[in-house]
Amino acid sequence: MSLPLLAVKPRTLDQRVVSYEVPAEDDPVIYRLTDATDAAAVDALIWAAYRQIFSEHLILASYRQPFLESQLRNRAISVRDFIRGLGKSEVYREQVAAVNSNYRLVDISFKRFLGRPTYGQQEQIAWSIILATRGLEGFIDALVDSDEYQQNFGADIVPYQRRRRMARPFNLVNPRYSDYWRNKEISLSGRSYYQARYYASGPLDKQIVRGAIPANFLSMARSIVVPTLDTQRHVARATSSLVKVPNTAQERDLPPTPVKPVPVALPYRYLPSQPKV
């Protein structure tokens, strides 16, 4: 038996205040299935749902849900059921739920499914109890079936951020994982193998690792090493000994060329050979 939702006192957030703002380009686009009259409009609605639930940097071809898309295109399910299916998919479980604590997962899910942040730690604790007792699928069902979701989005509207005044939408907040997970990844990547692994009895040091390795392991590894040969050198030596180079020298009976003295103009020839006294 799951525990009931604890009472939470709401806070004054942007979406709870009456707006007198002038419409601008930053206002969210509302996607309704009833307004989608052609295939292009349905595709735009589907991609808007992916951007809202999976976040912009998670829209990959491998993350798409073709079964849910086919049902939505054929009007077999509503937009609310499509959003429910995206929240229960393995992509949301692995990329969002598995890398965050329960408190941060509640806050992220509220931003993506209800379009608002949580009312502080009190609401995060209350909904984390639902997450712990009902699991991720029960938590998604509780969000989608809540009165707040029905009043703001109904069955045909893709969830969006209500009254956004931030520089970036909720679904684009990066990173998608919490500080604890990021610091854990950094600590594991900067430590050695002996420091990263732990047993229940304590840290795994080098002595325990060496005890698990047989004494003759290194000698056995050296014995199976195949000696390397310079194949190119041996092939070149074998081929060069078999190749016969033809003799291209031409043998002719030519008379010897006579050598005659040739007068040479030596330098400083204008000087007398014997100096005059």
Curated annotation (Swiss-Prot):
GO BP: photosynthesis
Residue ranges constituting the PBS-linker domain according to the UniProt record: 11-189
Its membrane topology: Peripheral membrane protein
Coiled coil: none
Entry superkingdom: Bacteria
InterPro entries: PBS_linker_dom (IPR001297), PBS_linker_sf (IPR038255), Phycobilisome (IPR016470)
Assigned keywords, A-Z: Antenna complex, Membrane, Photosynthesis, Phycobilisome, Thylakoid
Compartments in which it is found: Cellular thylakoid membrane
Keyword Transferase in record: no
GO CC, alphabetical: phycobilisome; plasma membrane-derived thylakoid membrane
Complex formation: The phycobilisome is a hemidiscoidal structure that is composed of two distinct substructures: a core complex and a number of rods radiating from the core.
Family statement: Belongs to the phycobilisome linker protein family.
Role description: Rod-core linker protein required for attachment of phycocyanin to allophycocyanin in cores of phycobilisomes.
Full protein name: Phycobilisome rod-core linker polypeptide CpcG1
Species classification: Bacteria, Bacillati, Cyanobacteriota, Cyanophyceae, Acaryochloridales
Gene giving rise to this polypeptide: cpcG1
